């Protein structure tokens, strides 16, 4: 028997879903710069991962740390000129983000695949997420605002699940599950992501998202002289980050840069931070000597996922 969600838990479920949807980039920035101050150990955690990995890194001898770090440096140096540029560091950090996202999805796949048959069904996904199978009528709105919001989110998840299922089998295989969890990483999900965003934000159905639609339900207080700070920030993002052709609206490709989590900015910021801190001769790039001289800083950065890469032979295994 399929059940709807228990009303008592709807509020909590909704909050959790909303938090998960928006927390990625802002959470990374908050952890990196709490109260606006740079946190040095954030870099190591990004490179190494969880505290257990950091502890394991500390156990490595100094020579072994250097050996593995030198191997990583060679891999980052894509043109083999002996220096790490902003672009090389940024590309490496983005690759690291993607690698660990894929690793996490693989771990989740095992947890969701309750009967260990190599696929995750929609029912298994529901059981893992909500401890029961939830099924909503697509055509019947709910009176309660929170319940209706949850229904909409749940139906969107179901549509994404169905889109990820390329072979129309009873469930998702690993590759399809990754597409479901990280549609931004899979080409065949791009059109779905854009369409989903247009359905949510394009209120007049013209195929674009205007500034007004971008800001949602915001209306300026008639007694206020100016917009609040957060609105000014959002307007600036619309104009300078997303509306590339400056036509006052977001086309589908511009919309994609808004709705899909984008690690490029975070990676570029970290690359610039490392060069700024470690570039001893001000040539805007890092030599192996500069990195080894500032080894602790480099191993507390996203470039090595806070040192985590020293324990993952996907990154450090190479001939020196």
Swiss-Prot record:
CDD domains on file: EFh_CREC_RCN2
UniProt binding sites for Ca(2+) 2: 113, 115, 117, 119, 124
Compartments, as annotated in UniProt: Endoplasmic reticulum lumen
Record: residues binding Ca(2+) 3: 167, 176
Keyword Endoplasmic reticulum: yes
Binding site for Ca(2+) 4: 202, 204, 206, 213
Database matches in PROSITE patterns: EF_HAND_1, EF_HAND_2, ER_TARGET
GO cellular component entries: endoplasmic reticulum; endoplasmic reticulum lumen
Annotated signal peptide: 1-25
GO molecular function: calcium ion binding
Tissue expression from the record: Ubiquitous.
Residues binding Ca(2+) 1, per UniProt: 77, 79, 81, 88
Phosphothreonine: modified positions: 140
Residue ranges constituting the EF-hand domain according to the UniProt record: 64-99, 100-135, 150-185, 189-224, 230-265, 266-301
Keyword Disulfide bond: no
Sorted UniProt keywords: Calcium, Endoplasmic reticulum, Metal-binding, Phosphoprotein, Repeat, Signal
Residue positions binding Ca(2+) 6: 279, 281, 283, 285, 290
InterPro entries: EF-hand-dom_pair, EF_Hand_1_Ca_BS, EF_hand_dom
Residue interval(s) of motif Prevents secretion from ER: 317-320
Main location: endoplasmic reticulum
Sequence similarity: Belongs to the CREC family.
Role summary: Not known. Binds calcium.
Subunit organization: Binds the snake venom phospholipase complex taipoxin.
Name of the protein: Reticulocalbin-2
The species this protein was found in: Rattus norvegicus
